[in-house]
Amino acid sequence: MSGLEAQQALFASNGDAIILGRIGSLEVRLANSRAAIQAAQELRFRVFFEEMGARKETIEAVEQRDADRFDTICDHLLVYDTALPVPEHQQIVGTYRLMRNEQAEKALGFYSADEYDVQRLKLSRPNLRLLELGRSCVKPEYRSKRTVELLWQGAWAYCRRHSIDVMFGCASFHGAVPAAHALGLSFLHHNCRATDDWDVRALPHRYQAMDLMPKEAINNKVALFSMPPLVKGYLRLGAMIGDGAVIDEAFGTTDVFIILPIERISSRYISYYGAEANRFV
């Protein structure tokens, strides 16, 4: 079953996507067409390759899309600006890729398993309902609180509907030199490391130490200010950080592993978005 086929619980009886949240002209919902997925891939290409300088393969350069084998299996959370006078698939201004256990089985593993020992999570808690978050990006002119809130609203609604126990995935620092992010990485290592029962370690051949500075040398305020917005957002929710960073040469990033058990999400955020994700519906 493809990602599109697996989404029926979040579609209305007429096949239209159910709106998971709305703020003004912005709406968040799941992709329910190949045109929508391709539009998300085009947005990812513009952000990751044209803006951030990821390395283009031949097919990506020709098609102008960031696409891989996971896209047909995953669900794609999309933010639309319905006020734009263009066809619907061209209204997409933000995206998040979501993959549950059963989808990962069809893909022969989670995307982040290429960098981290995700299998440890599955083996230590075989009954956990896992959700991998990835490929998060937003058009530059829409990088605002409203857009981010709608992406979180959509992810939270998805978690509630699928009874997810833990969210995880890679988050990135721009640049493939860990030492350039010594302050941020060291802060995460000393203050945000996962507890033993949730810990996930970078694969041995990709492991990069994060404790590049002693704890007493870290200015916490400056470290947090230097942190990528996505990482800070995860931390505010209650996320923990896995053991070791990983260099992603293709995307030109230094990645860290995010682990966010639902039980650890800050109560104020659950109150804000609603226990049943009905804040912006």
From Swiss-Prot:
EC top class, as a word: transferase
Transmembrane segments: none
GO biological process, one term: lipid metabolic process
Protein name: L-ornithine N(alpha)-acyltransferase
Consequences of knocking out this gene: Deletion of the gene abrogates lyso-ornithine lipid and ornithine lipid synthesis. It does not affect resistance to bactericidal peptides or permeability of the outer membrane. Does not influence pro-inflammatory responses or the ability to multiply intracellularly and generate chronic infections.
Keywords: Acyltransferase, Lipid biosynthesis, Lipid metabolism, Transferase
EC annotation from Swiss-Prot or TrEMBL: 2.3.2.30
Similarity annotation: Belongs to the acetyltransferase family. OlsB subfamily.
Function: Catalyzes the first step in the biosynthesis of ornithine lipids, which are phosphorus-free membrane lipids. Catalyzes the 3-hydroxyacyl-acyl carrier protein-dependent acylation of ornithine to form lyso-ornithine lipid (LOL).
Cited SUPFAM superfamilies: Acyl-CoA N-acyltransferases (Nat) (SSF55729)
Alphabetical list of InterPro entries matching this protein: Acyl_CoA_acyltransferase, Ornithine_N-alpha-AT
Pfam families in alphabetical order: Acetyltransf_5
Metabolic or biological pathway, per its Swiss-Prot or TrEMBL entry: Lipid metabolism
Reactions catalysed according to its record: a (3R)-hydroxyacyl-[ACP] + L-ornithine = a lyso-ornithine lipid + holo-[ACP] + H(+)
Entry GO MF terms: ornithine-acyl [acyl carrier protein] N-acyltransferase activity
Source domain of life: Bacteria
